[in-house]
């Protein structure tokens, strides 16, 4: 769903990407909700793409997200080892195609070098480096909680995966649309 400002509303899930010391991790919770009801607790919202060189997580309508993941895979085949170009091309199509612009989802995509948030309003956002080194990005209803927790932990003596797991745990304690059943993929 979109609000009156044409920015996507944050959907009921949490996806977090953490990059630190050459390691990149994307973690996603497993909860699927329909309104106030939890219908599934172990969904996989994080996937490997491009022969395992790219990881993508999604928030929003599941069918829409799978459509976008398929489109991203096609872009990655068209532009091998060029994640930024594939994401920009996907965002351009998503924004201009009459069918695609109705899709209600967001993607968080990473390879070994970069993290991107891709939205249906044409945004391809790459996070800057955090004050403690490394970078973090998050989407979904619990995204801001996970993002804040990860930023607070980034300068600690923790790996990217440890930061992601701790931050997602904090988000799950705060956001009712996020659970602690995580899928974690590392690059």
Curated annotation (Swiss-Prot):
Belongs to the peptidase T1B family. HslV subfamily. It is an enzyme of class 3 (hydrolase). It catalyses: ATP-dependent cleavage of peptide bonds with broad specificity. The active site is at residue 13. InterPro entries: ATP-dep_Prtase_HsIV_su, Ntn_hydrolases_N, Proteasome_sua/b, Proteasome_suB-type. GO terms for biological process: proteolysis involved in protein catabolic process. A double ring-shaped homohexamer of HslV is capped on each side by a ring-shaped HslU homohexamer. The assembly of the HslU/HslV complex is dependent on binding of ATP. Allosterically activated by HslU binding. GO terms for molecular function: metal ion binding; threonine-type endopeptidase activity. The keyword Cytoplasm applies. Its EC number is 3.4.25.2. The gene is hslV. It comes from the Bacteria. One of its GO terms (cellular component) is HslUV protease complex. Na(+) binds at residues 172, 175, 178. This is ATP-dependent protease subunit HslV. Protease subunit of a proteasome-like degradation complex believed to be a general protein degrading machinery.
